[in-house]
Amino acid sequence: MIRFERVSKMYNETKVVDSLHLEIKKGEFFVLIGPSGCGKTTTMKMINRLIETTEGTIFIDGKNIQDYNIDELRWDIGYVLQQIALFPHMTIAENIAIVPEMKKWDKEKIRKRVDELLNMVGLNPDVYRNRMPDELSGGQKQRVGVVRALAANPKIVLMDEPFSALDPLSREQLQKDIVKLQKKIQKTIVFVTHDMQEALTLGDRICVMRKGEIVQLDTPEGIIHNPANDFVEEFIGNRVRPWYEGKIIENVLPLVSGGQVENDASPLSIYASLQEALIRLEVEEAVPIERDGQYVGALTSRHIVTYLAAQMKERG
């Protein structure tokens, strides 16, 4: 879907992105994370040419992005900003309709699309269609920002720390909403964040960056199980470890139900440690869990990631 081949970006003599080689799969939720100045936002902005590459090539569906008409490229890539950036003197419907109007959709098609998108994020079109941005809460504005990016049905959506300016409750709700929304729309989403809990909650894969380079690219489970080096261990591992050290499988039990496991897989007790479960899950997709000899469910890496993300959020 999106492929970087030896992509670099320089400002004066400083390389802010250094020879990136990566591929983002169609329909995946791909998270870029790292400390401030690591190049994650620059990497994302090179996809829609808001920032031009210095070296290397980016391909979308096998085509060099330099071969696209730049306006059409950007119209076909949704973009959600941290600052939301709704036009204050336009109604909510008018804000959402900007790109469809640029693409010369007819008015009835636009009206139906606006109403469909508002319903998709829980905003009643009859109530919100003709409101002005200053009549909405921060969370409602960001919902509009998200659906505006989806208005022309792009294949790709870029999200630049879209929830970081929101209060904790709004942020948590929007994270849940975007997970549900992605299950429906199956877009290719590139999401920038500095928040590990957010990355664990949202990402199919997480790309950890440092000084313009990829340090580790893996699933949330893979990064938790096998941090690539001391930097990842410090940036992610040390943040996660306090939430599983000393914990037992029983702590995760509310998340576990049903599931299929290999017939010959030996069960773990609910009183076994999460560390023991993690070791098993390095080589097994699911581990059967038993209580007093009775099967209670199959534990997967995703159960543990969900538990750890919730613990990190709850305790900061």
Regions found by a protein language model. Give the residues of each.
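ABC ATPase "signature
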Residues: L217-D218, N226, A298
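Conserved ABC ATPase "signature" region
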Residues: E108-V127
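The conserved cystathionine-beta-synthase
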Residues: V261-E285, I289-Q294, T300-G316
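A short, proline-enriched helix->beta-strand linker immediately N-terminal to the Walker B motif
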Residues: A151-K155
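Conserved ABC ATPase signature
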Residues: R131-L136, Q140
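Helix-to-loop junction immediately C-terminal to a conserved catalytic motif
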Residues: N48
